[in-house]
Each structure stands twice: as structure tokens, then as C-alpha cells.
Amino acid sequence: MSGAGIAQVGSWLRDSERRFRLLAFGGALTMFLVQPPADLWMLGWLAPLPWLAIVQQPRLAGRRPWLVLWAAGFAHWLAAIHWLRLPHPATSIGWVVLSAYLAAYVPLFIWLARGLVHGHGWPLVLAAPLAWMACEQLRSWVLGGFTFAALGHTQWRWTTLIQAADAVGAVGIGGIVMAGCAGLAALARSRIETRRAGVLRGEALAAAGIVVATLGYGGWRLATEPAPSGSPLDVLLVQGSIDTELKHDPDAAGDVARHYDDLTMAGLEQSDSKPDLVVWPETMWRWGLVEIDPAERLDEAVVERMLGPAAADADAKQGEERQARARDALARERLDALAVYARRYGTHWLVGLDKQVITPRASGGVEYFNCGLFLDAAGRPLACYDKMHPVMFGEYVPLADRFPFLYRLTPLPAGLTAGREPVAVEIAARLVAPTICYETALPMAVRGLVRTLTAAGRRPDVIVNLTNDGWFWGSSELDMHLTAAIFRAVEVRTPIVIAANTGFSAAIDGSGRLLERGPRRATATLRARVQPDGRRSPWLALGAVAGWGAVAVVTAATVAGALRPAPGRTTAPAGGAVPKEGRRLVPEPRSGRE
């Protein structure tokens, strides 16, 4: 570059508003690059630096700095969750709306952190992690929670570091990464602000101490891993590769069943020994179960189809008996086909499928469930788990149970009903508990499952996740979903195995190590031998105390700052802006102090 060009760039950067925008959108870019698909994970310790530079600025440049920050967040989230547009044209609306909502956390983080730094004089290495954790905790809770693309998730490969998730959760790991980044920022500033160099170096040292202490804790937790006891659970995870679309295809059910059956038989033939459990992903058995409430009276034509004509002299009691037999026959009809497959596999089988419960208590007469059904080697059903946490707008529309017309505005024909309780089934002397789809993305859902079953004396030895990620065409959604499961395994100290259509099927131990992983958008069968963990964890006992603690501290400090009288205040608030040309809003105080 010529001297004139360098001078031109220098002149451009001297404009405070342009520099501010560069930092805002530069941070959006770096925070995107540390997540899949780029996945430059080690840069996670540097990625927040542009936003931290904004936090440290005495004033924000430009007339609408908060709008600029929101726009930067909007650009970031549009790129980070671009895969949300893939399932159906209508989901592009959800992609934009969700990105617009998530974008608000960028200005919120900077506003909170600036209030702590400039309003209370807190060091950046304390203010930034607390503000970040508060925002991520709120993001994991508001509207049911959205936890993908968390800062802590970038570090899933650093097994020693993420052991602390069993105490502070994934949100806390993000706070630790932010503390490390803030320490680097303080160290960099110490070379510029020579008068405060000692203080800033002390802050950097404190941040390094936090990271070192986290690694020390992680090393200790890894040293406490239980020795293998008894035989591992031998699981065959079947991963087909069928891209999922919202369209009616009368041949799809048979094609999907044949696809998965062929893969299963091929997987079984690869070994002389049978696995303890075969697992198919979510909804890969397309002929759903049917249950009929005894309070529901079947049409007589349906009863005749199932049982034949009634006797001419049948009385009311016999009519009720025929109703009960017909209900049982309808339910058994769907189970009989499943039993054929289970007997051929000759072992336990966990299969994802839908279920309809016909009942007068439902507003439309039918409740729909997303289920995981256990069958034994003889084809007998052992237990059925109904998904407890349906995805908002993906599997149900809020208030549509009262206003059914809302479904006509979406590609969904109907909404799912939430299941009522978790299930654990004993297989080969191990207790196995299923989850479905994004339940592994919800920290409190998995914690609740383990705590509920533990209270009943049935703490799971293994959690199985059934998921159909074929909606997302092999995109970075697969990586984000798998990463969430890794953190859940550490938090509850329970191995997780995943059967995923199009990937990633996986086996994860109780320390978050990825033992097996299937390919992206391709078929595979994984033979995972899973050892229970069973360690207790602070997360199981206390939950998101670190995340909510950060929310409480930051909220209290922010409210206190807002209520604190400021007589004689002569400068704009810490989060305020200055005009583009940089003029002061009020005269400089005589003392020169800000």
C-alpha cells in the first residue's frame, strides 16, 4: 500500500464513529468465526476483544450507538443460525425473528458491562464475565431458552477446562473464557496506560489465576473418574441419511423403514455378539402409535372393522366390552408391525416414532406426542417416553390449543403435547433414559430428568438422545447440537449416546470426551460400549446458581447505579453517546476528573 493509501486509512480510522462501527461489526465477525462452520475454537479467547474495547471506551461514538450494536448482533446471529432457514420457506421468518431477538443481547452485554466498569469502577476482568454470564443465562431461559453458539461451547475439545461445567454449567465456562479475554485486554492496555500499568497487570494476573484454577479443578475431576465396574452397555447406534422435508409422500414411511432396517441388519452382521440395545433416531418409524382414551366412544363402523359385526342380541354391557376390545386392537395393530422388527434384531430396540392419543379432553379430540418406544427381543413394549419439551414454533405454537387457527399460519398441521415424566428402562443391568431432539440443548431439562429419576431410585446410567437433524441438510446445526450434548454429559456426569438422522450420532462419556462420532449427512452404524459414571456434581445439586448469581449481582449493581444520586454530575452517563464530531455535551469540570 502506498503512503497516501496508508494515510487515507489512518484518517478513516481517526473518525470515532467509524472506529466504533468497525469494533461492533468486527466483534460480530470474530464471534461468528469461533463457532461452526469456521470453528476457529482457540480464538475464542480473543474473539470478544472488539466488544471489550467498546466496553472500555469512555463514551460511545455516534448518535445511535445502541442501534449499531444491535445491528452488529443481528448480522452475527443471521450468520450463526443460518441453518434455521433450511427446513421450510416459512422457517426463514423464524430465522429472522429469532436473530433479531438474540441480537439484543449484544447491546445489553455492553450496556451492563459499561455500567459496572464506568459507573461502579469494577475491573473489566470482573465486569465483563459477570455481564456475559448474565446475558447467556437469560438467553438460556427466556422463551424456553436458546443455548446454541454459546461462548463456552467453543472450548468443548479442551476436556480439562470444561470439567468445571459440572459446577458452573456451560454459561460459567463462557464466563471463564470471557475473563481470560478481559485479562488479555487489560494486559494490552497496560502498555498504553503506563500510569495504571501495575493495576492492569494485576487484573491480567487475576484473570490468569481464574483460568489456572479452572484447569486445576478440571484435572482433579478427571482424576476422580470412577474405575470401570461391570460390563459396559453395548449400544448399536443407527444413523441413516434422509433429508427431511415438510411434504406428503405416501411412499416415505416404507422407504425410511427399509433404509433403517437395512442399516441395522448390516450393523448387526458386523459382530458375532448382539448389542444390548439398538437405537433408531427420532421419528424414523413413520407409522405412529395409537392410544384411545376409555372415555372416547368409537364409531360403530370402526368397531365392526376391528371385531366384525356384533351379535343381534348384544346388550349394553357387551357393547362396552366390544368398545374396549376394539380400542386394544387398534393400539395392538400398530405395535404388531414393530414387534416383527424387534424379533428379527433379537435384542432390545429403542425407536423414535409419533403417537396419537384420541381423547375428549383434547381441544381437537387428539393429542400428538413425539416418542421413544422401548421393545424387548420378543417384541414386547417395555416403556414409552413422551418428549417433555417440544420446540416452540417448531413443534407447537403458543396459545394454539385455544386458538387452533394459528396453525393455519404455519407449516405445522398440529402441535405436540408435552410429555409428563421421564422414563428409565433397565437393560443389561443398566438404567437407560431417553431424551428427544433439542432436549439435550436445554441444561435444566437434562438436569430435571436426572434429578427426577434419581429421586425415584432410578438414576440413569446412560442417557440416549434420539434426534432427526435431517431438517438441516448437514449444516453447522449438527455441530452445535452435538456440542450441547457434550456439556450436558459433564453437567450431570452421565454418559450420553446419540442416534441422529444425517448425523452426528455419537457416544460421549461422563467427562465430555467424544468417544465415537458418525459422519455428516451420511450413513453409519456405531457400536458404542458405554461405562456408567455416576459421580455427583454441584450442578445436579444446585443448578444454574452461577448463572443466576451473575444475573442477581449485575441487576443489583445496575439498579443501585440508577438509584444513586449524582449531584453535580457534569458528564454523560457511562453508556452515553457523543455527537459525531466529538463535542462534549457539557463543559469539562474544573478538576478535570471524569
Q: Over which residues does each language-model region extend?
A:
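Serine residues within intrinsically disordered or low-complexity segments
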Residues: 2, 354, 589-591
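Membrane-embedded alpha-helical bundles of multi-pass enzymes
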Residues: 2-224, 258, 466, 473-475, ...
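Polytopic transmembrane helical bundles with strong interfacial aromatic enrichment
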Residues: 23, 46-48, 190, 201-202, ...
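Active-site catalytic loop in hydrolytic enzyme cores
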Residues: 84-91, 142-166, 340, 363-443, ...
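CN hydrolase (nitrilase-like) catalytic-core segments centered on the catalytic cysteine
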Residues: 102, 129, 278, 285, ...
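Soluble catalytic regions of membrane-associated enzymes that act on cell-envelope
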Residues: 218-392, 424-429, 434, 438
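Amphipathic beta-strand/beta-sheet edge segments enriched in Tyr/Trp
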Residues: 363-386, 504-530
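Juxtamembrane interface at the cytosolic side of transmembrane helices
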Residues: 556-581, 585-586, 593-594
